[in-house]
Amino acid sequence: MAQTLTEFDTIAAISTPIGEGGISIVRMSGEDAVKIANEVFKGADLTKVPTHTIHYGHIVDPDTDKTIDESMVTVLRAPKTFTREDIVEINCHGGIVVTNHILQLLLSHGARMADPGEFTKRAFVNGRIDLTQAESVMDIVRAKTDKARQVAVGQLAGGLLHKIQAMRQEILDTLANVEVNIDYPEYDADTVTAKQMADTAKSVIKKIDRLLKTAQEGKILRNGLATAIVGRPNVGKSSLLNYLTQSDKAIVTDVAGTTRDTLEEYVSVKGVPLELIDTAGIHHTDDKVEKIGVERSKKALDRADLVLLLIDASQELTAEDKALIEETKDKKRIIVLNKSDLGQKITVDEMKKQTGSDVILTSILKEKNLDKLEELINKLFFAGIENSNDQVMVTNQRQTSLLTKAKKELQDVVQAVEDGIPIDIAQIDFTGAWDTLGEITGESAPDELVTQLFSQFCLGK
């Protein structure tokens, strides 16, 4: 990208959530950040203090000489900052009025309101981080479990960046020799055959495949696993939701049909972030309100990554149970045989044989075997991942799509070589794969893509 830090103006934004709190932070970045802060700060002369120091004083409106708040001001000088520009962070008392007043004061003295994600964008443009690291900043903020945080921290440290760079270098080394072979065919000593180019393509494809295998887990860690709790009325769906969330969000009674809409809640189960959806009992009803809930339940079922299908083990299978077993057969699911404390007319072995699914016998009321249910959820989605020391994962659709595209280009290289196509023609896809991998890190990403990516960030980041 063409911009350098000297071409940027000075930006400001509130970096903490708006609302009441102990402390709020107003952040500035840019060439004039220290000068602007010094104009509204009564205390040490900020233009003369050392970098990476914090100073007590008061924020004062120079036009009225009125004190806005007492504060601690941190001065961080380029280039050893997040944006590689001068940064000033004003720590003031939390509260909407005082925080906005300080922000407006900075804007009136020459700063500009930052766009969403602009601080992180400047870190990228100034070479402080790559695009995968930039994405990890928001992943850390949005992490729903400690495992998600660990993966995001690994990305921020450059885990995925280093793997992508290594693949690009492998392609580039071969590509450079291919260019020599094409331009100077008379020098046979350094000739790189088409087979060698195909071998490099195969080597990189294997590395891409290893990353793509983590894409599903990465997506789940980033967005949560959409988990629909389904079953006919009064089989314990709401009780399971309340157990997993340790709350009483759902109404629990012995009256069928008390949940008339879908309830959603995020919860961590053995490190797996679940977006739990407690559905209304899926059954035939003439009640207009219940009908709406049943339709919404069916839509929730359609988008679910995992289905927890609850069946009353103390009763024989009903027509509604059988219909739900059929309706969810193509979903990844766990069948939960509940109410085992009331007797058992359905066995685990019978249900496994009939459905081919994982089956757990429980009593949610007595909290029996619910720990085994949690372990099974973890095993289904994170087998071999949870205890791995390798925290590098593909965590979003952008990364997955580009890796898939690069793999296809490399597969085309291999096919071209096998078909005897001239090396200079096969080289086109080889170069394309190198560029595509560069889009993941931002080394060859178009400006429009970069702008669109950072627009999804929150203000102050």
UniProtKB/Swiss-Prot annotation:
UniProt GO cellular component terms: cytosol
E.C. number(s) listed in UniProt: 3.6.-.-
Subcellular location: Cytoplasm
Cofactor note: Binds 1 potassium ion per subunit.
Primary localization class, coarse: cytoplasm
GO biological process: tRNA methylation; tRNA wobble uridine modification
Cofactor: K(+)
CDD domains per record: trmE, TrmE_N
Listed GO MF terms: GTP binding; GTPase activity; metal ion binding
KW Cytoplasm (keyword) present: yes
Residues the entry annotates as binding GTP: 234-239, 253-259, 278-281
Binding site for (6S)-5-formyl-5,6,7,8-tetrahydrofolate: R27, E89, R128, K461
Record-stated family: Belongs to the TRAFAC class TrmE-Era-EngA-EngB-Septin-like GTPase superfamily. TrmE GTPase family.
Complexes and interactors: Homodimer. Heterotetramer of two MnmE and two MnmG subunits.
Protein name, as recorded: tRNA modification GTPase MnmE
Gene name in the database record: mnmE
